[in-house]
């Protein structure tokens, strides 16, 4: 096989911390390479070096056998390397065609832009990807899956031979995921090479040809996917065997903590009723758009209910804002941690204590920094958050550690009920395992938990009961003992 890319002896330091140590990577023409490792293993740093976002400290990069120097993003693009980020880099207020050709517009004589040609070429590229999008449509009106195809179209326009895909299916529906896989297979047949970053093992074994595993900035193993098992890869990634992928603890739920009766928000969901007890995990399953997140945000006061009642501890409550919900003992962990759950340019410490300022302030509202430091350090130890210091900026942390900070922020309010919306999205298997154990710990403390997840095995194995939604309505409630993927999916698509 012919290598199209070789990265040899790549090392990188941030301050005194070595994040990559003598890492090698080989990518072959017309192959899909899975780049694996826990959050913080060095995957993103390695790819940012390849794409010209960071400069390497040591090592060499070879393309088609020739040594190259990639100093910036323009260099990477010149060499045919493109990265499709987890947080898509599109301009929402521009059209599909404008985004595809941004910075590469066709210019006529006298510097006027040839929009007709741009639209024709945009439609042609999208058609080749199996997409018949209206190229005049604004990107903000597209689904995440459609936006991703626009990103891929952009990369093909610049004749990219190497595509880096970072958690490409994290926010996609099942249908969009299947469409993406078809596109990847088509690109592979055309001789394109893809580096695929994902924590979803079933995807790795379906779509990838080769693998490379990093741990703590070092190369652990690389080879062909056909030569390893799921457990082999997990052990390489975490450096140990995870005895249970889903460490469920049986519990005896206590008294009722939350009751929702006929809750309705017009245009989102209607007549939703369910109960959550102390020390119980109630899982919410359903396809994207089923209304699960909307129900959660209404309970948390983000949306105003049209009708229905909410009871806490047997008493009806009025929740008009998230502040009301927090004061009544309800916390919500958002599915979108970067835009709703955290302020990424602020520090770990500032984010963690944001919802519990009263706890660290004196009677006139002045922050007691000694108390703040003590509480933050305690949470860092309790949740095993890996950071250089409490003053580290959130965007510098790995996805798993960002999620732990968001969870810590929830726990510092001493909630009676916590709503976890996609708590393990985009984090590695080791961090997932730690969050599952934390859920068990919360159960033991008698906290009621609502778990929303698009990963069916997660809902089935962590929940005590499962509520299924379809198009804004509850279509069934299934006990843990009776639940199977087939039963849940049947109700998730509106079946009986």
From Swiss-Prot:
Catalytic activity: D-ribose(out) + ATP + H2O = D-ribose(in) + ADP + phosphate + H(+)
SUPFAM superfamilies in the record: P-loop containing nucleoside triphosphate hydrolases
Binding site for ATP: 37-44
Subunit-level organization: The complex is composed of an ATP-binding protein (RbsA), two transmembrane proteins (RbsC) and a solute-binding protein (RbsB).
Protein name, as recorded: Ribose import ATP-binding protein RbsA
Alphabetical UniProt keywords: ATP-binding, Cell membrane, Membrane, Nucleotide-binding, Repeat, Sugar transport, Translocase, Transport
Gene symbol of the encoding locus: rbsA
InterPro entries hit by this protein: AAA+_ATPase, ABC_carbohydrate_import_ATPase, ABC_transporter-like_ATP-bd, ABC_transporter-like_CS, P-loop_NTPase
Family named by the database record: Belongs to the ABC transporter superfamily. Ribose importer (TC 3.A.1.2.1) family.
EC number from the UniProt entry: 7.5.2.7
Record flagged with keyword ATP-binding: yes
Occurrences of domain ABC transporter (ranges): 5-241, 252-496
Mode of membrane association: Peripheral membrane protein
Domain of life: Bacteria
Molecular function, one GO term: ATP binding
Organism: Caldanaerobacter subterraneus subsp. tengcongensis (strain DSM 15242 / JCM 11007 / NBRC 100824 / MB4)
Compartments it resides in: Cell membrane
Predominant localisation class: membrane
GO CC terms: plasma membrane
Function in brief: Part of the ABC transporter complex RbsABC involved in ribose import. Responsible for energy coupling to the transport system.
PROSITE patterns from the UniProt entry: ABC_TRANSPORTER_1, ABC_TRANSPORTER_2, RBSA
Enzyme type, top EC level: translocase
